[in-house]
């Protein structure tokens, strides 16, 4: 391990935190960066472990809301329905992710061209949804009905394809099912907590014999950068999308996907 490895870990942690909660696919960005810049020393297990920084970022920002949910849960039926809705939305990813884990890691994660194509397709979808004259029926995540939560959960499973984006799929699904932009992004935040925690725990178990103690410093640096940048994004994203929508992220995806695809076609 040298200074370059630490800078690499810091850069990857920064990218993870900045892109995890916005609809641009953090996994897709990390895979493309690893492919084009040759960041191989940390490996894909490292990329999973630094997600813990992003998980703790959202838990930190949402600590007051989570505490209120915890205290209201025993006596408030609306709060219980919301928590049950999050669990229902999480179940499809938990089941399908466990069953398809090997295929996802060994095939989908090794196909950078697929990442670029999904980034481009997702960019067009975001731009399309953003300009629709939708009439939202739900302005508070607490009011999402259980069938809607389950549908969002199945839509989230599309994000097992790198480049699709977990937050992008859940936000688009929520919007098309009647949510407004702010609550769609917030529901994506809440759903990220069990989904990311579950993926982290499962990948950590699967990779328990791969990481060595020598990787501790790299993971620590990546974790800190993912946490700091993740806190920044979570704090400001809801206000941003309420005012400006998702157009910026649609163009972001189109540019990154197109540049990546062109580079793959030219240099491989």
Curated annotation (Swiss-Prot):
Catalytic activity: di-trans,octa-cis-undecaprenyl diphosphate + H2O = di-trans,octa-cis-undecaprenyl phosphate + phosphate + H(+)
GO cellular component, one term: plasma membrane
Coiled-coil stretches: none
KW Hydrolase (keyword) present: yes
Primary location: membrane
Domain of life: Bacteria
Topology of this chain in the membrane: Multi-pass membrane protein
This enzyme's EC code(s): 3.6.1.27
Compartments where found: Cell inner membrane
GO biological-process terms attached to the record: cell wall organization; peptidoglycan biosynthetic process; regulation of cell shape; response to antibiotic
Signal peptide stretch: none
GO MF term list: undecaprenyl-diphosphatase activity
Ranges annotated as spanning the membrane: 3-23, 46-66, 84-104, 107-127, 144-164, 184-204, 218-238, 248-268
Keyword Transport attached: no
Alphabetical UniProt keywords: Antibiotic resistance, Cell inner membrane, Cell membrane, Cell shape, Cell wall biogenesis/degradation, Hydrolase, Membrane, Peptidoglycan synthesis, Transmembrane, Transmembrane helix
NCBIfam families: PRK00281.1-2, PRK00281.1-4, undec_PP_bacA
Function comment: Catalyzes the dephosphorylation of undecaprenyl diphosphate (UPP). Confers resistance to bacitracin.
HAMAP family: Undec_diphosphatase (MF_01006)
Note: Bacitracin is thought to be involved in the inhibition of peptidoglycan synthesis by sequestering undecaprenyl diphosphate, thereby reducing the pool of lipid carrier available.
Family: Belongs to the UppP family.
Name of the protein: Undecaprenyl-diphosphatase
Organism annotation: Brucella anthropi (strain ATCC 49188 / DSM 6882 / CCUG 24695 / JCM 21032 / LMG 3331 / NBRC 15819 / NCTC 12168 / Alc 37)
